Amino acid sequence: MSGHGAPDIDPTALDGSGLRVTVVAGRWHDEISAGLLAGARRVLDAAGVTTTVIRVPGSFELPVVARAALDAGADAVVALGVIIRGGTPHFEYVSDAATSGLTQASLLAGKPIGFGLLTLDDEQQGIDRAGLPGSKEDKGAEAAEAAVTTALLLKSIRGA
């Protein structure tokens, strides 16, 4: 499983009080998306951050809305989406655009975006990673942990 070797971060040890985090989540593949969102919210609530959730139509829209949230004052964004490979090149186009766009948004804003975009060969891979009952991984929680941890690290580096 891809989660082998993942860092062991205790979300209850994260003190994100004072941080503002926006979760931007796509609506495609609702069962998986809902699991990702629940995992992210659980971590953000435990860390004590102020959380805003914005739902977007799909993964292609994640970068522009993530950047807008960062420009509007969010300290970090958690980007959640699900793209499942089909029989056309559409999968590659959307996956590449969303991934590159999120990277650019983060770098240009100088703020972290937790990457919770699942690019999958089939629905079962998403269920296995969505933090649902019986799932092997919780990528929504992992993305939220990464966003909060990195936001705190950047605040420390910048002396804020």
Curated annotation (Swiss-Prot):
It holds the Pfam family DMRL_synthase. GO terms for molecular function: 6,7-dimethyl-8-ribityllumazine synthase activity. The active site is at 90 (proton donor). One of its GO terms (cellular component) is riboflavin synthase complex. Belongs to the DMRL synthase family. It catalyses: (2S)-2-hydroxy-3-oxobutyl phosphate + 5-amino-6-(D-ribitylamino)uracil = 6,7-dimethyl-8-(1-D-ribityl)lumazine + phosphate + 2 H2O + H(+). 5-amino-6-(D-ribitylamino)uracil binds at residues 28, 59-61, 82-84, 115. This is 6,7-dimethyl-8-ribityllumazine synthase. Gene3D superfamilies: Lumazine/riboflavin synthase (3.40.50.960). One of its GO terms (biological process) is riboflavin biosynthetic process. It is an enzyme of class 2 (transferase). It comes from Clavibacter michiganensis subsp. michiganensis (strain NCPPB 382). HAMAP family: Lumazine_synth. The gene is ribH. Catalyzes the formation of 6,7-dimethyl-8-ribityllumazine by condensation of 5-amino-6-(D-ribitylamino)uracil with 3,4-dihydroxy-2-butanone 4-phosphate. This is the penultimate step in the biosynthesis of riboflavin. Its EC number is 2.5.1.78. (2S)-2-hydroxy-3-oxobutyl phosphate binds at residues 87-88, 129. Pathway: Cofactor biosynthesis; riboflavin biosynthesis; riboflavin from 2-hydroxy-3-oxobutyl phosphate and 5-amino-6-(D-ribitylamino)uracil: step 1/2. InterPro entries: LS (IPR034964), LS/RS (IPR002180), LS/RS_sf (IPR036467). CDD domains: Lumazine_synthase-I (cd09209). SUPFAM superfamilies: Lumazine synthase (SSF52121). Keywords: Riboflavin biosynthesis, Transferase.
